[in-house]
Amino acid sequence: MGLTYQLLPALVCLLACTSFIQGCKYDITLQEIIKTLNLTDGKGKNSCMELTVADAFGPKNTDGKEICRAAKVLQQYKRHDRSLIKECLSGLDRNLKGMANGTCCTVNEAKKSTLKDFLERLKTIMKEKYSKCS
């Protein structure tokens, strides 16, 4: 029982697309996060970048819990800040929550860093994750 010649190209395309999609689950989300973080760099002169936030990152920065914690920190910051940077952070917050995939987490408020340092560290982590996807 052979495949008809009309069906064969469709199956090849389907297989190729499936393997491409499975390469990295959050490829587009990571690109969007990195782009947003690059935009916030330009606003580094803003005084809100010197505000202190909870430092959500551990030494390895690889598990989903740390992404969840980063989303929580940004969510807490958004509640208290009314500046223009809030618009950028809302998209960032949404993307991080999506990557955390509904993971529940808590943030240790004892360790603090500036918002600028927090965002720089987050950008480094996202770039590392993106490089692993490529």
Curated annotation (Swiss-Prot):
Keyword Transit peptide set for record: no
Glycosylation: residue positions: N38, N101
Keywords (A to Z) from UniProt: B-cell activation, Cytokine, Disulfide bond, Glycoprotein, Growth factor, Secreted, Signal
Disulfide bond listed as a keyword: yes
GO molecular function: cytokine activity; growth factor activity; interleukin-4 receptor binding
Record-annotated disulphide pairs: C24-C133, C48-C88
GO BP field: B cell activation; immune response; interleukin-4-mediated signaling pathway; negative regulation of inflammatory response; positive regulation of DNA-templated transcription; positive regulation of macroautophagy; regulation of immune response
Subcellular localization: Secreted
UniProt cross-references to Gene3D superfamilies, sorted A to Z: 1.20.1250.10
Signal peptide positions on this chain: 1-23
One GO CC term, this protein: extracellular space
Annotated family: Belongs to the IL-4/IL-13 family.
Function: Participates in at least several B-cell activation processes as well as of other cell types. It is a costimulator of DNA-synthesis. It induces the expression of class II MHC molecules on resting B-cells. It enhances both secretion and cell surface expression of IgE and IgG1. It also regulates the expression of the low affinity Fc receptor for IgE (CD23) on both lymphocytes and monocytes. Positively regulates IL31RA expression in macrophages. Stimulates autophagy in dendritic cells by interfering with mTORC1 signaling and through the induction of RUFY4.
Protein name (Swiss-Prot/TrEMBL): Interleukin-4
Organism the protein comes from: Equus caballus
